[in-house]
Amino acid sequence: ENKKKFLVIGPLLALSYKEIFNKVKENKMWLGYAKQLSGFRLDDGTELLSKNPEGSVPRACKWYTNLDVSYRNDKITLTESVKDKKYEKYYNYKAINITKTLKIPYDYKGEMGVPISFISKYKPKQFKIIGKGTVVKKTKTWKGDKASLWTEKNGKPHKIPFERILIQNRKVNES
């Protein structure tokens, strides 16, 4: 808000917080270079390693920043075509379900639901973030569930088990 530069370590799941997600969506904050931190040293010299002597693993952490990181200007090479593959459509929202970033089609103009892990690969010049799947207005509900995205399996609605981010390709056919 006050235009100061920052670099903060936070839990991966912070992306699911409304305030954090909105900052990412508005390009006011993004992930830094490190893909995932599972060990680091604290000021007092204490080391948090991937596994401590008791065998437990610290939670996955990310760098959250508004500092310029060059990878954000790169492009994800998209090799899939919507014409060559059948993508699941949502039962209650006009978009297709994408299971992995590598499966994003280069020739699809509509909205797509991608896993929340997409944020670590997000390129703002290539993609537009529409919103989180749990908060966009649905076309219909199933069993009173107004938040979840559903696909259709065997003729019946099937709940998507994990949060989805809805995106749109700004550069259709430019893979």
Regions found by a protein language model. Name each.
Residues 1-175:
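Class I S-adenosyl-L-methionine-dependent methyltransferase catalytic core
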